Curated annotation (Swiss-Prot):
PROSITE patterns (alphabetical): MPN, UPF0758
Domain MPN: 103-225
Keywords recorded for this protein, A-Z: Hydrolase, Metal-binding, Metalloprotease, Protease, Zinc
Motif JAMM motif in this chain: 174-187
Protein name according to UniProt: UPF0758 protein BCG9842_B0662
Length: 225
């Protein structure tokens, strides 16, 4: 009996999932369940290992394109589609938890709301959350993608959506692809410019959160707002 269970453990991840639960599986085993089969040359677990190695683990894999996936020997359109669909479902499930008028009472609340969506992005994304008078999220919008500087982040684009949504206040966020959320001089200058504009037009910029890899910095807590 122990021998059979050892085979299940090592070579049949789907059966192990049924016996022990999905939480007991490693990343390679979960990936193998999604792939279902290997190729003529290698088992499904070997194929899983190859994929994880190619993308340096889950961090890069979650944003893999169709072209990148099918470039791997043993991955065709069908397997690539299964993986991409699974990753998108995961992203949507994370969003579902917070989409019903999520209330932001602290920098921690804001970071929790956006962390999983932003921490793996490979380019800087500047995002604004538009809040009502109860600090509930009315809308969020990506203002631009690219390196942050004062010439790119124009207050007009930030506050235009605030007027459209009748927002009482704004929280700005952007990610550092390096994983280190330490603010740069440009980050601070952009923040001060937006705060000044908000004071003039009567829409408060509550904070600017920089997202790293499971870390964040609040420029309000740092004294820059």
């Amino acid at each position: 009996m122990n021998g059979i269970r050892d085979v299940v453990r090592e070579e049949q991840p789907r059966e192990r999932l049924l016996l022990e639960g999905a939480g007991s599986l490693s990343n390679r085993e979960l990936l193998a369940v999604l792939l279902r089969t290997g190729s003529k040359e290698e088992t499904v677990l070997k194929l899983s290992d190859k994929i994880l190695h190619q993308f340096d683990g889950l961090r890069m894999l979650k944003d893999a394109t169709l072209e990148e996936l099918i470039s791997i020997h043993g991955i065709g359109i069908s397997k690539a589609s299964q993986l991409m669909a699974a990753f998108e479902l995961g992203r949507r499930m994370v969003r579902l938890e917070y989409q019903n008028r999520y209330s932001i009472r602290s920098p921690e609340d804001c970071a929790k709301y956006m962390m999983e969506e932003m921490r793996f992005l490979q380019q800087e994304h500047f995002v604004c959350l538009y809040l009502n008078t109860k600090n509930q999220v009315l809308h969020r919008q990506t203002i631009f993608i690219g390196s942050l500087n004062t010439s790119i982040v124009h207050p007009r684009e930030v506050f235009k959506e605030a007027f459209r949504r009748a927002a009482a206040s704004i929280i700005c966020l952007h990610n550092h692809p390096s994983g280190d959320p330490t603010p740069s001089r440009e980050d601070i200058e952009v923040t001060k410019r937006l705060v000044e504009c908000g004071q003039i037009i009567g829409i408060e910029v509550l904070d600017h959160i920089i997202i790293g890899d499971h870390k964040f910095v609040s420029l309000k807590e740092k004294g820059h707002i």
